[in-house]
């Protein structure tokens, strides 16, 4: 079971805010879509949303998030007048859906956008924007697995027949850390020797077996 960075009660607000941020930056301020994605993933804003910081989940509007992203990464102040829309834009849905998947999977926004280009997401919009969001998550999961092959830790753990939760309990290494090592959200090569030793003892392998080449 994936450990989420924040409670589900905050998810809808976070999704709406990121959707509004994408819509405002791309449609109102005319920032090229791939540029805004690059700004967002490079900014501290994306990391703070991943970590579940309340100020960025419920305390800021989408426009404020877009302004913070662009100011931090380019030094420019966005001051475009917000526009009224009759419905939710394609760009809104993209931000909204990606925010859900980040929460659901605990993967970084950076990793998600390494796999999904804006064009990919545009194409998914036409077939998925009226579907249940879990269908989007399932499709993206498949794409992520195809792109990020199994880590040595996951391969060895699976062969040993041990779940992530069992490995965490027996090794004393947090479940969240094990998940992040397996998803490559944390570099296992930079893990403490003690953590690597504990995991290796449980799985009956060497520390070197766990490291990524």
Regions of interest found by a model, annotated:
Residues 26, 157, 168, 200:
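The alpha-helix within a helix-turn-helix
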Residues 173-189:
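Recognition helix of helix-turn-helix/homeodomain-like DNA-binding domains
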Residues 8-68:
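N-terminal interaction modules that seed assembly of large macromolecular complexes
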Residues 153, 167-168, 178-181, 210:
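Conserved hydrophobic/aromatic packing and binding residues within compact polymer-binding modules
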Residues 163, 174-177, 192, 206:
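Short coil turns linking two alpha-helices in DNA-binding domains
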Residues 66-74, 193-209:
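DNA major-groove recognition helix of helix-turn-helix/homeodomain DNA-binding modules
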Residues 139-161:
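A short, Lys/Arg-rich alpha-helix, primarily the initiator
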């Amino acid at each position: 079971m994936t450990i989420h960075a924040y409670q589900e009660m905050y998810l809808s607000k976070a999704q709406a805010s990121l959707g509004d941020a994408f819509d405002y930056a791309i449609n109102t301020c005319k920032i090229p879509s791939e540029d805004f994605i690059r700004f967002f993933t490079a900014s501290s804003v994306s990391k703070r949303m991943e970590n579940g910081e309340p100020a960025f989940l419920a305390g800021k509007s989408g426009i404020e998030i877009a302004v913070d992203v662009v100011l931090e990464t380019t030094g420019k102040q966005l001051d475009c007048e917000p526009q009224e829309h009759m419905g939710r834009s394609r760009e809104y849905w993209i931000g909204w859906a990606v925010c859900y998947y980040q929460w659901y999977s605990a993967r970084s926004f950076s990793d998600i956008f390494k796999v999904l280009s804006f064009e990919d997401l545009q194409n998914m919009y036409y077939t998925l924007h009226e579907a249940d969001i879990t269908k989007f998550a399932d499709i993206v999961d498949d794409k992520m697995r195809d792109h990020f092959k199994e880590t040595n830790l996951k391969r060895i753990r699976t062969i040993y027949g041990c779940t992530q939760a069992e490995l965490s309990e027996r090794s004393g290494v947090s479940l969240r850390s094990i998940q992040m090592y397996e998803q490559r959200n944390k570099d296992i090569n930079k893990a403490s020797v003690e953590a690597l030793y504990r995991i290796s003892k449980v799985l009956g392998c060497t520390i070197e077996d766990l490291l990524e080449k």
